[in-house]
UniProtKB/Swiss-Prot annotation:
Origin: domain of life: Bacteria
Protein name from the UniProt record: Putative glutamate--cysteine ligase 2
Pfam families tied to this protein: GCS2 (PF04107)
Function of the molecule: ATP-dependent carboxylate-amine ligase which exhibits weak glutamate--cysteine ligase activity.
KW Transferase (keyword) present: no
Family affiliation: Belongs to the glutamate--cysteine ligase type 2 family. YbdK subfamily.
A biological process from GO: modified amino acid biosynthetic process
Methyltransferase in keyword set: no
Amino acid sequence: MALETFVNSEPFTFGVELEIQVVNTHNYDLTKAASDLMRLIQGETFPGNITPEITESMIELSTGICHSHEQAVSELHAIRDVLVKAADQLNVGLAGGGTHAFQQWSDRQIYDAPRFQYISELYGYLAKQFTVFGQHVHIGCPDPDSALFLLHSMSRFIPHFIALSASSPFVQNVDTGFHSARLNSVFAFPLSGRAPFVLTWDSFEEYFTKMVNTGVVNSMKDFYWDIRPKPGYGTIEVRVMDTPLSVDRAAAIACYIQTLARYLLTDRPLKLSEDDYLVYTFNRFEACRFGLEGTCVNPQTGERRTIAEDILDTLDRIAPHAAALGSRAALDEIGALANARVNDASWLRTVFKQEKSLNETVRQQCLRWRE
């Protein structure tokens, strides 16, 4: 199969995708209701899209093409409200969060769609374990070479996105010690990790053709990279975030990525090299394990600082681009999180400490989702 033609898109437009937990309202375990939700929303009018995901216990919402923080917030609220209304009719709950706190993966049912059945057959139990919930952000790129430049420039900031969005401290009734345990499920897939270091679309097409010829992949969907190009949309897709507990937090993180993209592609402050990835896996682990308190190592200078400190320094550098995009309010929220060194994982642990019940913790997640 040939690689799709890269469709040039308006630079720095963006779209947001959120995978959502579907839970019962008895003990707040995951439940099988995605098909029923899809039937109930037929005929409803809303921006963007709502689609099923790999198991019956999750559903995905996505915005249209957004230009601003204000538009993203408006669209996410509108789509969220349609889903909440349908969930109320079914007496089920919806929640953000990168993992469900106590579900058993073996109870999951694969959604009846050809691609999901194919993934289940290929990956076995990993497919059911993949009932984890992420936020993806697409960023519009003017041409394919710019997309690859942005992809590799953005990789330096992957720890920021993980730490800011982290909302998965609990897995199967256990506090994992991680801020984002969700990504441990993603790492199990053989085509996860980072994209190959190529900087021209011609070289990327050669790589893709070689991979297709091995029989390992059929399309870009088979790559579970942290950031991957999406040629049919004319975007790069940042895929490392946990789904936040609120749509407002999701919009703020998306606009942080949008503003970074404008800075990286307009100012071109980084000279890219393969050595940028020397500490990539270490930095990513630190963000997953320790959140905003994790260590971030600069691959060029060897300088070490906390991820929170690196975010605050980055916010200063990209401030002019935030003003140009109208994203100051979003970046103020990001700055507040970095200054306080708290994220949704912190909130979940606080609730559990107070309530001493993961069932009650998930119930409060459902309330947060409605805010």
